[in-house]
Amino acid sequence: MALQETIEQTVTGLGYELVEIERTSGGLLRVTIDMPYLAGTAPGAEQFINAEDCEKVTRQLQFVLEVEGAEYSRLEVSSPGIDRPLRSEKDFERFAGELIDITLKAPIGVAASAGSTVSASRKKFRGTLERAEPVDGKPGWQIVWSDEPAVKPGQKISKKRIPAPLQALGFTLDEINQARLAPVVDFKGRRPKSVADTSIDK
């Protein structure tokens, strides 16, 4: 059985969601897990991964990987953190309304409408994830943002300054090279103060 499949079956079998698997040249096997998404969960009611969850998955993975003869020198199981990757439609559904960073596979090109201030060669965006109309039968999404100029520390913002206009870019998952939650520290929302992480040498 392939390593990806082995780890995913083990993680989901314990009631968690596999977010990401990373292997380094130094022999580190890093497994990122999260609580499964339940549609309709009220804001603020979502559960988070803690150290006990990571330890539970670590123990089971150690046993399974030894049986499978997987080669690694160190196993690390952790929660996604504040810059969680978004890969599936379920991830986008789960984090609709959140601030995200996306990188397109190709520049927006003609998607930059006439009069837009967005460069046609732009590929990276940060904004709020929203649902949009389906495209060719596929779920549609859009990112909404405003290109406000950066404010320097101590700089006063004039009350007369006109806010930058909101802009939106529609896309499907097929057009995304990478997407992550924007690493914004908000202890009252998405993530608890401590990020669970368990690392054990083989």
Swiss-Prot record:
It holds the Pfam family RimP_N. One of its GO terms (cellular component) is cytosol. Its main location: cytoplasm. Transmembrane segments: none annotated. Signal peptide: none annotated. HAMAP family: RimP. PANTHER family: RIBOSOME MATURATION FACTOR RIMP. NCBIfam families: PRK00092.2-1, PRK14642.1. This is Ribosome maturation factor RimP.
